[in-house]
Regions:
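Alpha/beta-hydrolase fold nucleophile elbow
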Residues: 16-27
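Short glycine-enriched nucleophile-adjacent loop
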Residues: 30-41, 46-47
């Protein structure tokens, strides 16, 4: 939700000695980060990892009729000032939504695959301009990071579309599109992942993602490159 708490957080940071405000998010939070940065010009560094270039229909996770996730009818994932943002509706409703995930996941080698939800929903109808994220409004520095072998959605394609959108529209941000052949959905900096999982990182990744099992060296190289690039960008941004 893009709500007053974002603005409150920015003002609090600035009032407590922070000259600059940055934002970082991965997966659904990557989309959230992009939207927030497009609304708040005080955000001058954005790291969007595996982010989509559009807002999605809302969804819930838990247990409903044997399903672990389901779409919420006529609901957006994000809102602004109490009003839902336009969104791409999923072509599948409950319970078919989760059944499609199960079908795609079966025998894939991934603990979960959901690319069909997004591919089929995009085929069912063209995106409206209203539901696309206005990345051209983002200020400062913008890093768009994703991998072609993402098992959740087509992160690489979304980054290329944002790249094209920025080429076609006036913007002031300095942006860097980073699309890797191998990296899985977890295109996090290596050091950050190791903080979260100091022991057994490679085992966990191989258990979750087939690509991490088949291309362990390439995926690790991707994470280390991301670490290097984002760390350098953060250091430069802080020094400006």
């Amino acid at each position: 939700m893009i709500n007053p708490s974002h603005e409150t957080a920015i003002k609090w940071l600035q009032a407590n000695g922070n000259r600059k405000v940055g934002i970082m998010g991965m997966s659904t939070a990557g989309m959230d980060s992009l939207v927030a940065a497009s609304y708040f010009p005080d955000i001058t560094l954005t790291f969007a990892l595996t982010a989509s270039d559009f807002v999605w229909q809302g969804f819930e996770q838990g247990n409903k009729d044997g399903c672990k996730e389901w779409p919420i009818p006529e609901t957006s994932t994000l809102s602004w000032k109490g009003e839902p943002l336009p969104y791409m509706p999923f072509v599948y409703e409950h319970p078919v939504y989760w059944q499609k995930i199960e079908e795609e996941t079966k025998g894939s080698g991934d603990i979960e695959r959901s690319t069909c939800l997004f591919i089929d929903s995009e085929k069912a109808r063209e995106h409206t301009e209203e539901e696309m994220i206005k990345v051209e409004n983002i200020k400062g520095k913008l890093f768009l990071v994703g991998a072609e072998d993402d098992s959740f959605w087509e992160a690489g394609k979304y980054i290329r579309r944002m790249d094209q959108r920025l080429k076609e529209r006036p913007h002031t941000c300095e942006y860097v599109p980073l699309v890797y052949e191998h990296g899985t959905h977890f295109v996090l900096p290596e050091s950050m992942l190791r903080m979260a999982l100091p022991v057994g990182l490679k085992f966990v990744l191989r258990f979750i993602f087939r690509a991490a099992k088949e291309y362990p060296k390439e995926c690790e190289a991707t994470r280390k490159d991301i670490d290097k690039k984002l760390s350098a960008a953060l250091k430069e941004w802080r020094a400006e």
